[in-house]
Every structure is written in C-alpha cells, then in structure tokens.
C-alpha cells in the first residue's frame, strides 16, 4: 500500500516494481521512477497484458482509463455498433502507447496493448525541445488514429 509520502525517485521506482511483481509475478521490466514514464523505464507488451489480465475488469483499473467510442460514421456496420472500450494512454516525445479493455457487442472481452514509437526522432531531440518537440503534435495524432483504427478493427473482428 502506498503511503503518499514523498520519497526518493529510486525508492519510489522500487516500490512500483514490487507492486507490479505482486500483481504479475516475475517480470523483466524496469521502473526508473514512480510513474513508469522515465527514460530508463521498460516493460514488454507481454508484461502489460499479464498486468491487464490479472487486473481484468476491476473497477480500480478501469476507472483510471478513458472511454472511447467507435467513430467511423461512414460504415453502416459501425454506425449501429455499440461496445465498451477503455484505454490508458502514455504519450511523450514520440512515444505513444495504449493499453486497455474491449467488450464487444456480443459480450466477448478482449485485452490489448499497442506500443508505438519513433526512437530515431526521440533520440535526436535536444534538451530545449523536450517539453514541446517539433512535429510531435502531428506524430501524436497519427499514432492515436492508428491505435483507434486497430481497436475498432479488433472490436468488429472478434465480436
């Protein structure tokens, strides 16, 4: 249980790692800070799926996620499609990740993890551009559009 105390970043990262290990068992990832967003933080898509599966449909996990609706209005199939899509996103400096849950119209429950990055652009950033990288907004829109296209495709395919 987290106490809310301000702790050193490394101690906080260790607490997060212990918490995750308690949820999914052994893992090969790494937290460099409490948020998991630090440069040294790493986790595989497989480990993220294990976490989602072990937390599956718990209100504590789902309430942290955004709701998404199928948006493609030109398709008659999608116009009448209703489903449950929840996502937790992480987008920063040419890294755009999304993970969450889909419940299809038929009631089938799916888990997904989509990890996307342009590490070449990210690694070329100079320190002064890290808060607002050039072209990052355009890249973020493209990766988000691709992620939502994949989710919508899976929701329909596995209905």
Identify the residue ranges that each predicted region occupies:
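Short, well-ordered beta-strand elements
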Residues: 108-134
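Generic hydrophobic alpha-helical scaffold/packing signal
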Residues: 17, 49-53, 86-89, 100, ...
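Active/binding-pocket-proximal capping segment
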Residues: 61-75
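Short, gly/Ser/Thr-rich active-site loops of penicillin-recognizing serine hydrolases
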Residues: 134-159
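Short, Gly/Ser/Thr-enriched beta-strand-loop segments that form substrate-interacting elements
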Residues: 77-106, 113-116
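Active-site-proximal beta-strand/loop segments in catalytic clefts of secreted hydrolases
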Residues: 1, 34, 67, 89-90, ...
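A small/polar active-site loop signature that marks catalytic segments
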Residues: 1-62
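Flexible loop/turn segments at secondary-structure boundaries
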Residues: 38-39, 72-74, 119-122
């Amino acid at each position: 249980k987290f106490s809310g105390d301000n702790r050193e970043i490394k101690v906080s990262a260790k607490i997060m790692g212990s918490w995750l290990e308690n949820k999914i068992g052994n893992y090969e990832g790494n937290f460099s800070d409490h948020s998991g967003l630090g440069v040294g933080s790493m986790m595989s898509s497989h480990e993220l799926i294990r976490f989602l599966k072990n937390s599956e449909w718990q209100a504590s996990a789902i309430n942290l996620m955004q709701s998404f609706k199928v948006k493609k209005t030109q398709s008659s199939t999608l116009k009448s499609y209703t489903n449950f899509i929840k996502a937790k996103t992480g987008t920063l400096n040419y890294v755009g990740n999304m993970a969450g849950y889909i419940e299809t119209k038929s009631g089938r429950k799916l888990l997904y993890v989509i990890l996307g990055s342009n590490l070449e652009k990210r690694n070329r950033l100079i320190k002064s551009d890290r808060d607002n990288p050039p072209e990052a907004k355009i890249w973020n829109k493209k990766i988000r559009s691709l992620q939502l296209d994949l989710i919508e495709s899976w929701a329909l395919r596995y209905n």
